[in-house]
């Protein structure tokens, strides 16, 4: 009986030690958003990324808050997801072709 308890204890210990603790980070990305449509596009682009737990854009500050797992997605990948849908992301400029596809109200000078 003692052997069974010892083996079970060792087994549980190995399982517990084998699990990685995943870190979660929060990042704030400055965007070129202009309106509610921009907000929806930016939040969708970020939330679609694997590893993103939560993303929200504050239209007043044009700052996107993103909670994500760095082991699944990098900060650069998050920025690129915004660039690809037509928005600036910090110092990265929006893809000009993607900007052309945005509604007029979402393009620079649209409001």
Language model features with spans:
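Short amphipathic alpha-helices in soluble, non-transmembrane regions
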Residues: 41-43, 77-85
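N-terminal targeting signals for Sec/Tat export/insertion, comprising classic cleavable signal peptides
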Residues: 26-56
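Helix N-cap motif at beta-to-alpha junctions
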Residues: 69-75
């Amino acid at each position: 009986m003692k052997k069974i308890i010892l083996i079970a204890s060792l087994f549980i210990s190995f399982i517990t030690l084998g699990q990685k603790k995943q870190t979660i980070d929060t990042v704030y990305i400055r965007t070129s958003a202009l309106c509610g449509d921009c907000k929806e596009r930016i939040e969708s682009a970020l939330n679609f990324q694997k590893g993103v737990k939560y993303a929200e854009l504050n239209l007043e500050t044009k700052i996107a808050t993103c909670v994500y797992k760095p082991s699944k997605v990098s900060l650069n990948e998050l920025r690129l997801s915004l660039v690809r849908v037509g928005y600036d992301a910090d110092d990265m400029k929006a893809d000009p072709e993607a900007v052309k596809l945005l509604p007029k109200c979402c393009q620079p000078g649209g409001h």
